[in-house]
Structures are given as C-alpha cells and as structure tokens.
Amino acid sequence: MSSTVEFHDRMLSLGLARVAEQAALASAKWVGRGDEKAADQAAVNAMREQLNKLDIQGVVVIGEGERDEAPMLYIGEEVGTGTGPGVDIALDPLEGTTLTAKDMPNALTVIAMGPRGSMLHAPDVYMEKLAIGPGYSEGLVTLDMPAATRVSALASEKGCSPADITVCILERPRHQEMIEEVRSTGASIRLITDGDVAGVMHCAEPEKTGIDMYMGS
C-alpha cells in the first residue's frame, strides 16, 4: 500500500499510548534492581512488539542507534503491519536507564510520530536544548543568547528578579561554564543527574515544579 495514505493523528494516538504504556510496564519490573541494560532491553522488546501491531508503515528516524549498534529499533528500521499511513518515528523506549536501575524519579518512555518525511534524521550527537514555560513572547530566549542573557530576558518578562528564576541543567562537566554563568545572575539551578527529557517537561508547569527554564546539551 502507498505510504501516502492520509495521516490521522487522532486515530493513531491511542495506539501510541498503548505502545508507550507497554514499554513502561516492561521496564518497571527492573526498577531498583541495578541492571540498566536489562531495564532498557525490556522496554525495547515491548515497544517493538507493540509498534508492529499498529497499522502503519513506520520508519524509525531517531532510535536506539545506527543499525550496526542496535539490534532493534535502530535508525532506519521499518515497523508496523505495513498497511496504513507512512510515518516517521522518534523514540526512546527508556529515557533514564540509570534512574530506573536506581529507583529514582523522572525515567520516561518517549515516542513521537509524524507523517513520512516530517522528522529530522538527527545523528547521535549532543544537541543544544532550551525550554521555557508557557505564556512568554515568541523568541524571548534563543540558542544564540549567552546563558546569562536568557535568564535576564526571562526574568524581565516574568516581572521578577533573576534571583527568582530557577534553571534546570543536566549535571555534566561540559555544562560547568554554563552553570557558573547562570549562577552569576543570581538565579538558582536545579541540577539533575539524568533524564533531561523530564527536565524539559518540568518547564511546562513551573507553578508545580518550580522550574522556569531548561538549558544544556
């Protein structure tokens, strides 16, 4: 069947929820058991099994790695029944393997889907991330800005002092200069050991999480 069959996101959303649910349940059995690889493999197996039940012509564009690095859900792998719309898929069956193994919060199952050709085929490299909460002006902060400028811009629009801003950053040596620059503004930093997808999501509800911005690579 042609891969140009119309893409209906509402029709696929329940199927994707099932895919994510089964991957999460499979990895949950390994919470706190100190085995990152087993937790990840359980999630991969479950996600792949469920994806292959969906009526899609799916191609993994962001996955577990290149074909020679990952036996399943590798970049370029075709999934689904082979009928239905052609789709691109970005996934991480278990984002936060260390968090899972240590029974720590913020491990997630992540999957996104779009029409064929709609997703960037990104290589396995560090990419800059920047997120703020809702309600701010478009373009208020950008990747081109120094970290301190981002904090000042956000504080100005929020109507508060930089000291009232909290930034979430992944604790890695490569971020040390950024951490120092943010702290120089008076802003506080919530360092996380893993799980930067969750860190980005925390920005969506700053009144609950206390996090105003995420930045890092």
Annotate each PLM feature:
Residues 1-90, 152, 197-198:
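N-terminal subdomain of lithium-sensitive/metallo-dependent phosphomonoesterases centered on the IMPase/IPPase/PAP
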Residues 33, 37, 97, 140-144:
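Short gly/ser-rich anion-binding loops that grip negatively charged ligand groups
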Residues 52-53, 78-84, 92, 100-104, ...:
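Solvent-exposed alpha-helices and their adjacent loops that cap or buttress functional pockets
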Residues 60-64, 89-91, 100-102, 121-122, ...:
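General beta-strand structural signal in soluble alpha/beta enzymes
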Residues 79-80, 109-112, 210-216:
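Short basic, glycine-rich beta-strand/loop surfaces that mediate nucleic-acid
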Residues 84-95, 99-120:
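DPxDG-like acidic metal-binding loop motif
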Residues 115-150, 154-158:
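Glycine-rich phosphate-binding loop plus the immediately following alpha-helix
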Residues 144-217:
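An extended, acidic
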